[in-house]
């Protein structure tokens, strides 16, 4: 089971998550609905530092990772980056092409992930 820690999590909850988690901790970068933000929360670095004070597990940031810019910013301070909603959006944008041009859809999604990967190069995440 992967545990989620949010910016609204109390210190007590973070301690409990750290004690029970295995593999990594999923750090929610924003409050609100997933995929609805354009920027990484300004307090994300402090939030990750607070969680790190309770665990040595890798911290993966998700929610709000919509662009190469946000992926790069998250990768600079986290051990992993999780992309969900924006992947679904890319697939949905290309749904009319799935039947007749499935390779084009795959290429569009791969190009999007390549742009995320490029943005994360030479960051803390890529160096570990």
Please place each PLM-identified region on the residue numbering.
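Histidine/lysine/aspartate-rich catalytic loop segments that bind and position anionic ligands
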Residues: 3-35
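Glycine- and other small-residue-rich loops at beta-strand/loop junctions that grip anionic moieties
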Residues: 2-6, 36, 40, 63, ...
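C-terminal helical cap(s) of enzyme catalytic domains, especially alpha/beta-barrels
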Residues: 88-125
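Hydrophobic faces of well-ordered beta-strands that scaffold small-molecule active sites
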Residues: 1-5, 25-27, 59-63, 81-83
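Alpha-helical scaffolding segments of alpha/beta enzyme cores, especially the outer helices
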Residues: 16, 46-50, 73-76, 111, ...
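Catalytic cores of alpha/beta
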Residues: 9-18, 54-55, 61, 65-81
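Glycine-rich phosphate-binding active-site loops on the catalytic face of alpha/beta enzymes
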Residues: 27-35, 77-97
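Active-site-adjacent beta->alpha loops and helix N-cap segments on the catalytic face
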Residues: 9-15, 34-49, 68-71, 94-101
